[in-house]
């Protein structure tokens, strides 16, 4: 039995996991404006509501850069006070339970590899589309973090007049002074501009998938995050863009591209 913590953009979730299922969950808005210690106290209190003597491990999914070996969290964007938090050490000292801390997208792909669309494959890439873009990599059945825990930061690669994140996340809608939610509603009503915007997102995402295939050559790519819930609006344009001028067409026919259907990925993969 283990306990998992998901530090989302706005909410903090703590769940107890048994046999790959969340059996108890507490959730509340994260005290994002609190001091380092105030946020930690929120952690401690919520963990205390869920933990039992049978819990053998605590796993934490963090939306930031993490030193996986040391369990140190750096520069959490939505929590300004968290510049360098030795989270593994603090939780192990407080609860006496072995703790691991990892980037949330690594947790996402780990969950998909074990329980979701990546089950049965050895080489998996998972990407999440939301306010930003992240990627997690499983190779030979292990999460690959790189020498300095920076593997998978494909969002930072140059693209057009910026980088891929600016064109494959909600930042693209920001360029149009709108939101994905608004454009989804308009597209459903037949608005041609909104439909074109979702197709443009799909086009850029197809180019990002080309990068993933060229660099990682996975068996399966799994797409998750809030924007992925609108996959039916951009999937066709995405696949057309992926095939356009791709140098190894046979690779596209072999790779599986799936949209995540797994709930509580970050909790299950932490």
Segments (PLM) and residue ranges:
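ATP-binding/phosphotransfer module of carbohydrate and carboxylate kinases, centering on a glycine-rich
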Residues: 1-57, 67-70, 89-97, 112-121, ...
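Phosphate-binding/catalytic loop of phosphoryl-transfer enzymes
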Residues: 57-59, 65-164, 268-270
